Every structure is written in C-alpha cells, then in structure tokens.
C-alpha cells in the first residue's frame, strides 16, 4: 500500500517544532487556533516534541503532551530566545526536520491583514507539512514568500529546515538589539553555509502583507 509506505516513511523521520509565543490579550486565541491546526493536520502526532518559548509570565493551560515549555528571561517581544534554543538544539542534533513558527500578530491589536497573512503561512508549513519535509530531501529549507533582500529570508518567519543546515547559521543574528534585532531573527535563516531555499508559494515583491488581506482564494488551489 503506497499510502502506508508513505506514512511509515514520514513517521520514521525526526520532526521537531519550535514555537514562539508572546503573551497578551490576543495571544491566547491565536495559540489555541495554532495548536488546533497542528492536531488536525496530523503534525502534532508525527512530531517528537514542540518547544514553546514564551515571552510573559502567565501560566499556560491546555498544553500539548509533547510540549517543552521555556519562559524566556529577556522579556522582549521578538523571537530571539526561541530561535536561540532551536539553534542550540540543531547544533547537538543534526538529523532533525525542524519547523519554526510563532503567534504572528500577537504583539498588536487584531489586524485583519495580519490574521490573513498568518492563515496563509500556516496553510503551507502546517497543513502541507508532509510536502515540506519531502522537499527537505532536496533543499535545506522550505517556506513561502521568499525574499532575497536585505538578506535571504522567508517573509513572516514561518519555515521548515534541516537541523544540519540550521547548525551552520550565523549566531550573531541572535544578539542584535532593538528593531534591527527583531528583523535579524527573521533574516537568520539565510545566513547558513549553503542557503538552498524552496519557495512553495511566490508572492510578488510589491505585495505588502500589512496593507493587503491575502485571502484563501489566492493560494488554496495550489
């Protein structure tokens, strides 16, 4: 049975998730939606663990059984410490397929454009996770909305990558501060020895996701 063989092949891979959560009034709803999507896609069952890096001090409820929770000490909104945890893990574990994503939009009031952007990103890295890990047999990283300037990155900072590639990233991107630091965490994915990206859905460079509600009819039939 081809489906059984495919499922067995997927389950034999080591899958790890690194998820960043900035706590505020909106983040609880985003968190619940994203965890639900991990379950319904089958990814939560397939992964070995999900590292949840939290900025904030509120107690977490409804945690997945596979969750490894870390309350970040530097209480900045950006993903720095969660990315750092992922980087250190990759240095020690070179044979994993790693998903990185975050509670996009949690640091702002509800903005329809950001909600639509998050739905778009989640569709590719969560709903289509099997395709992503298949692509990692050919490429070092997989995502959507690839941008090459000012440094190669996936706009929005949701992606999959091989941990042996993540281990080669430039760790200086972890420690810059201020607004440039937040941007550097997103740019870090392109700083490795051999950035060989797979862009699952190209979005025209003139498309500003902060101004546009990027609806599902733009991508669901891919």
Where are these regions (language model features)?
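ER/Golgi luminal nucleotide-sugar-dependent glycosyltransferases, focusing on the catalytic module
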Residues: 8-222
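Short hydrophobic targeting helices and cationic amphipathic motifs
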Residues: 2-4
């Amino acid at each position: 049975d081809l489906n059984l063989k495919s499922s067995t092949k997927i389950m034999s891979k080591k899958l790890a998730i690194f998820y960043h959560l900035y706590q505020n009034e909106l983040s609880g709803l985003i968190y619940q939606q994203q965890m639900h999507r991990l379950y319904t896609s089958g990814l939560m069952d397939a992964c070995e663990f999900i590292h949840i890096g939290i900025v904030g001090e509120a107690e977490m409820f409804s945690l997945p059984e596979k969750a490894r929770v870390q309350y970040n000490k530097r209480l900045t909104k950006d993903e720095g410490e969660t990315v750092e945890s992922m980087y250190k893990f990759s240095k020690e574990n070179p044979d994993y397929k790693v998903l990185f994503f975050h509670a996009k939009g949690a640091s702002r009031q509800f903005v329809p454009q950001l909600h639509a952007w998050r739905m778009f990103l989640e569709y590719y890295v969560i709903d289509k996770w099997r395709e992503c890990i298949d692509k990692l047999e050919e490429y070092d990283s997989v995502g959507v909305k690839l941008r090459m300037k000012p440094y190669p990155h996936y706009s929005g900072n949701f992606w999959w990558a091989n941990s042996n590639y993540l281990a080669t990233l430039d760790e200086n991107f972890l420690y810059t501060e201020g607004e440039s630091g937040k941007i550097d965490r997103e740019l870090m994915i392109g700083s490795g020895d051999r950035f060989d990206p797979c862009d699952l859905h190209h979005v025209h460079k003139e498309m500003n996701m902060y101004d546009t509600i990027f609806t599902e009819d733009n991508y669901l039939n891919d």
